[in-house]
Protein backbone atom coordinates (compact mmCIF):
# COMPACT_ATOMS: atom_id res chain seq x y z
CA UNK A 1 0.00 0.00 0.00
CA UNK A 2 1.05 3.54 -0.72
CA UNK A 3 -0.50 6.71 0.64
CA UNK A 4 -0.46 10.47 0.66
CA UNK A 5 -1.45 13.00 3.29
CA UNK A 6 -1.95 16.39 1.65
CA UNK A 7 -2.82 19.71 3.29
CA UNK A 8 -4.13 22.45 1.03
CA UNK A 9 -4.60 26.06 2.13
CA UNK A 10 -6.96 28.05 -0.07
CA UNK A 11 -6.46 31.74 -0.85
CA UNK A 12 -9.81 32.89 0.53
CA UNK A 13 -13.38 31.70 1.11
CA UNK A 14 -14.37 32.17 -2.54
CA UNK A 15 -11.37 30.11 -3.62
CA UNK A 16 -12.20 27.47 -1.00
CA UNK A 17 -15.75 27.09 -2.38
CA UNK A 18 -14.45 26.77 -5.95
CA UNK A 19 -11.77 24.30 -4.81
CA UNK A 20 -14.45 22.19 -3.10
CA UNK A 21 -16.42 22.07 -6.37
CA UNK A 22 -13.31 21.01 -8.29
CA UNK A 23 -12.60 18.33 -5.69
CA UNK A 24 -16.18 17.01 -5.89
CA UNK A 25 -16.06 16.71 -9.69
CA UNK A 26 -12.68 15.01 -9.61
CA UNK A 27 -13.73 12.70 -6.78
CA UNK A 28 -16.66 11.38 -8.82
CA UNK A 29 -14.25 10.35 -11.57
CA UNK A 30 -11.82 8.75 -9.12
CA UNK A 31 -14.64 6.75 -7.53
CA UNK A 32 -15.96 5.56 -10.90
CA UNK A 33 -12.68 4.77 -12.64
CA UNK A 34 -9.94 3.79 -10.19
CA UNK A 35 -10.18 0.37 -8.57
CA UNK A 36 -6.59 0.76 -7.32
CA UNK A 37 -7.51 3.83 -5.29
CA UNK A 38 -8.52 2.28 -1.97
CA UNK A 39 -9.27 5.49 -0.02
CA UNK A 40 -9.64 9.04 -1.32
CA UNK A 41 -10.96 11.05 1.61
CA UNK A 42 -11.23 14.84 1.71
CA UNK A 43 -11.78 16.74 4.96
CA UNK A 44 -12.34 20.30 6.13
CA UNK A 45 -10.22 21.25 9.14
CA UNK A 46 -12.13 22.37 12.23
CA UNK A 47 -11.37 25.99 13.06
CA UNK A 48 -9.39 26.56 9.83
CA UNK A 49 -11.96 27.26 7.11
CA UNK A 50 -9.43 27.68 4.32
CA UNK A 51 -7.71 24.32 4.86
CA UNK A 52 -8.53 20.96 3.31
CA UNK A 53 -6.83 17.68 4.14
CA UNK A 54 -6.71 14.72 1.76
CA UNK A 55 -5.94 11.16 2.84
CA UNK A 56 -5.22 8.99 -0.17
CA UNK A 57 -4.45 5.27 -0.07
CA UNK A 58 -3.53 3.26 -3.16
CA UNK A 59 -3.16 -0.48 -3.67
CA UNK A 60 0.49 0.14 -4.61
CA UNK A 61 2.70 2.71 -6.32
CA UNK A 62 1.57 1.46 -9.74
CA UNK A 63 -2.05 2.32 -8.82
CA UNK A 64 -0.87 5.75 -7.68
CA UNK A 65 0.95 6.30 -10.98
CA UNK A 66 -2.21 5.25 -12.85
CA UNK A 67 -4.19 7.74 -10.76
CA UNK A 68 -1.73 10.53 -11.53
CA UNK A 69 -1.90 9.80 -15.29
CA UNK A 70 -5.68 10.19 -15.61
CA UNK A 71 -6.86 13.19 -17.64
CA UNK A 72 -9.20 14.36 -14.86
CA UNK A 73 -6.40 14.18 -12.27
CA UNK A 74 -4.04 16.12 -14.55
CA UNK A 75 -6.78 18.74 -14.97
CA UNK A 76 -7.27 18.86 -11.17
CA UNK A 77 -3.53 19.30 -10.59
CA UNK A 78 -3.47 22.21 -13.02
CA UNK A 79 -6.78 23.87 -12.12
CA UNK A 80 -6.27 23.74 -8.34
CA UNK A 81 -3.38 26.20 -8.41
CA UNK A 82 -5.65 29.21 -8.99
CA UNK A 83 -7.37 28.51 -5.65
CA UNK A 84 -4.41 27.65 -3.42
CA UNK A 85 -2.01 29.62 -1.25
CA UNK A 86 -0.06 26.54 -0.07
CA UNK A 87 0.24 22.78 -0.51
CA UNK A 88 2.02 20.32 1.80
CA UNK A 89 2.45 16.66 0.78
CA UNK A 90 3.60 13.70 2.87
CA UNK A 91 4.20 10.33 1.21
CA UNK A 92 3.08 7.47 3.47
CA UNK A 93 4.13 3.85 3.88
CA UNK A 94 1.26 1.77 5.27
CA UNK A 95 1.93 -0.04 8.56
CA UNK A 96 -1.48 -1.19 9.85
CA UNK A 97 -5.05 -0.07 10.26
CA UNK A 98 -8.69 -1.02 10.64
CA UNK A 99 -10.77 -1.35 7.50
CA UNK A 100 -7.85 -1.80 5.14
CA UNK A 101 -6.59 -5.18 4.04
CA UNK A 102 -2.96 -5.59 3.06
CA UNK A 103 -4.15 -7.98 0.33
CA UNK A 104 -6.30 -5.23 -1.22
Regions found by a protein language model. Give the residues of each.
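Short S/T/G/P-rich N-terminal loop/turn motif that feeds into the first structured element of a domain
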Residues: 1-52, 59-69, 85-104
Amino acid sequence: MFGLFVRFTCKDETAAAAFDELVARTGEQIHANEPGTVVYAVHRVDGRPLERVFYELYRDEVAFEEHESKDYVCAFLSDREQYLAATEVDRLGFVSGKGVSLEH
